[in-house]
C-alpha cells in the first residue's frame, strides 16, 4: 500500500465523507511518538486508547488509567503525526458524573494535546452527553458493544449480541449516539450478524468502526501491539501481521551474547583519540 501525500491533518468530518464515498476507514492505536509516526502514513485516524494501561503499564483493565496519562501519551502521538486525525479516549471516571464534567475534561484534552476528537464509551444513556459536547465544539466518537470500562458490570470482557433483544438494544444505542452528533462509533466485540445489521443501518449517519465486529463496518481498528505480535495474549478478532516479539527477543539475545563474549562494543562502536 502506498503512502498518502496530504497537506493538512484529517478532521472528524473527513471520516463522515469517507463513509459517504464508500472508502474504508483505517485506524490503529498508538501511544508513542515513534510508532505514531509509522502508522500516520497509512491511517485515517490514530486512537490514543486507554488500552495503554494494559499495553504499556501491565494493568489488568483500563479502569486505573487517568486523564493525565491520556494527555501525556496523546501529546507524544501528536508530535509523531502530521496527517491522521488523532482521537483520545476519555478514561473511566472523567465523563460519567455529568455533562459538565465531560465537557471540562474533554476541553482540557483537546486544549493540552491538540488532538482532533475524543472517544467515550456507552450507548443511549450517554446521548445527552454526546449532544452537549458536540454542541460546544467537541468532536465525539462513540463506542458500544463490549465496552472495556464496564468490565466489572459485564462480568468480564464478554462478546455482546448473543442475548434476546441485544440487536435492538445495540442498534438503539448506535442510533442514539449518531443522532446526538457523534461522527463515528466503534463497534467492539459484537457477534457478526448483529454488528452487520448496525453497520448497514441507513438511519446511522456516523461512520462505524469495527474491532471484533464485522467487515461491513465503514472502517476497522486494531491495537498496534496486538497485530504486530508483541502482546502475550490477543483476542480472537486479532490477525497477526507480524512477529515483533520474536524479533525483539532475537535481537536482545544476540546483544546479551555479544556483551558476555566481549564482542560488543567493537572498534566501530567506540571513539578513537583525535
UniProtKB/Swiss-Prot annotation:
Q: What GO cellular component entries does it have? A: cytoplasm
Q: Output the GO biological process annotations, alphabetical, semicolon-separated.
A: pantothenate biosynthetic process
Co-factor remark: Binds 1 Mg(2+) ion per subunit.
Give this protein's Gene Ontology molecular function annotations: 3-methyl-2-oxobutanoate hydroxymethyltransferase activity; magnesium ion binding
Task: Report the principal subcellular site.
Answer: cytoplasm
Reactions catalysed according to its record: 3-methyl-2-oxobutanoate + (6R)-5,10-methylene-5,6,7,8-tetrahydrofolate + H2O = 2-dehydropantoate + (6S)-5,6,7,8-tetrahydrofolate
- The positions annotated for binding 3-methyl-2-oxobutanoate are 50-51, 89, 119
**Cofactor(s) it depends on:** Mg(2+)
Q: What is this protein called in UniProt?
A: 3-methyl-2-oxobutanoate hydroxymethyltransferase
Gene of origin? Answer: panB
Amino acid at each position: 500500500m502506498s503512502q498518502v501525500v496530504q497537506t493538512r491533518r484529517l478532521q472528524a468530518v473527513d471520516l463522515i465523507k469517507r463513509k459517504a464515498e464508500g472508502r474504508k476507514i483505517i485506524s490503529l492505536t498508538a501511544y508513542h511518538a515513534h510508532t505514531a509516526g509509522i502508522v500516520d502514513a497509512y491511517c485515517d485516524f490514530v486512537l490514543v486508547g486507554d488500552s495503554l494501561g494494559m499495553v504499556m503499564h501491565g494493568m489488568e483493565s483500563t479502569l486505573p488509567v487517568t486523564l493525565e496519562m491520556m494527555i501525556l501519551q496523546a501529546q507524544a502521538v501528536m508530535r509523531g503525526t502530521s496527517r491522521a486525525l488523532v482521537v483520545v479516549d476519555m478514561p473511566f471516571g472523567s465523563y460519567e458524573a455529568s455533562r459538565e464534567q465531560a465537557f471540562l475534561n474533554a476541553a482540557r484534552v483537546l486544549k493540552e494535546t491538540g488532538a482532533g476528537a475524543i472517544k467515550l464509551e456507552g450507548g443511549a444513556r450517554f446521548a445527552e452527553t454526546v449532544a452537549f459536547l458536540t454542541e460546544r465544539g467537541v468532536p465525539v466518537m462513540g463506542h458500544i458493544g463490549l465496552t472495556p470500562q464496564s468490565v466489572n458490570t459485564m462480568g468480564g470482557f464478554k462478546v455482546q449480541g448473543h442475548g434476546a433483544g441485544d440487536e435492538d438494544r445495540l442498534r438503539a444505542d448506535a442510533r442514539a449516539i449518531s443522532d446526538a452528533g457523534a461522527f463515528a462509533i466503534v463497534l467492539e466485540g459484537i457477534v457478526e450478524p448483529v454488528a452487520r445489521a448496525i453497520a448497514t443501518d441507513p438511519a446511522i449517519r456516523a461512520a462505524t468502526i469495527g474491532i471484533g465486529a464485522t467487515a461491513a463496518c465503514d472502517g476497522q481498528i486494531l491495537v498496534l501491539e496486538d497485530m504486530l505480535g508483541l502482546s502475550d495474549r490477543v483476542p480472537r478478532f486479532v490477525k497477526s501481521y507480524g512477529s515483533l516479539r520474536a524479533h525483539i527477543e532475537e535481537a536482545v539475545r544476540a546483544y546479551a551474547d555479544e556483551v558476555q563474549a566481549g564482542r560488543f562494543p567493537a572498534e566501530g562502536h567506540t571513539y578513537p583519540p583525535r
